[in-house]
């Protein structure tokens, strides 16, 4: 198996090394693991691509490259440049430093990479490590992802539910904010929504008196509805959320089609 690994935290992020180790387990001795990751921090860029400017790509080692672009750019670079003669069978994005559960998923560059892979009909999984008081000061805050990552990916590959249409399924996996020994298991869960925890802006002044706005995030320890992703994470479970690149709301479409007749 040939695996392309990317992230949104950048080429030097600790979570990328975690995912490289996981990918090597999945690929096996006869497989290949290639890394194409952003040269700098790209958190919060979602599924953006850099079609208005060229991207610089740098070779770090035989199968490791950095790209001056977004996570989705890195996927494109991996598919159509770095691995163009031997395209990947699987794309893994992460392991993100922080959760991408609930409405956080809508901003995530980690998930943006998985979306891009799915558009090109390649199986794609986004993985993120929830951080909180019970794991952030651990020697290895990514311990849960390190320990269970390969197991979760192998299950998803075994079950083989990726869809067959033009718009296909990818997976959003979030590891709970606890150490590996405290993980209670895994649960399939839909996206939750954090009430009163969305992004806002915080005004500030520079020393020269110029006005700036900082994006400000809300607390991450607010549980979502029962059995949704962030809620199961905060209760010690790994959440697995199937997601689709088709953004159509078919329920509303059906109702409106009857009204527009």
PLM region descriptions:
Residues 9-17, 206-208:
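Short acidic, Gly/Ser-rich segments with clustered Asp/Glu that frequently serve as metal-coordination loops
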Residues 28, 80-85, 112-123:
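Alpha-helix C-terminal capping segments
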Residues 99-108:
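Glycine/threonine-rich flexible loop motifs
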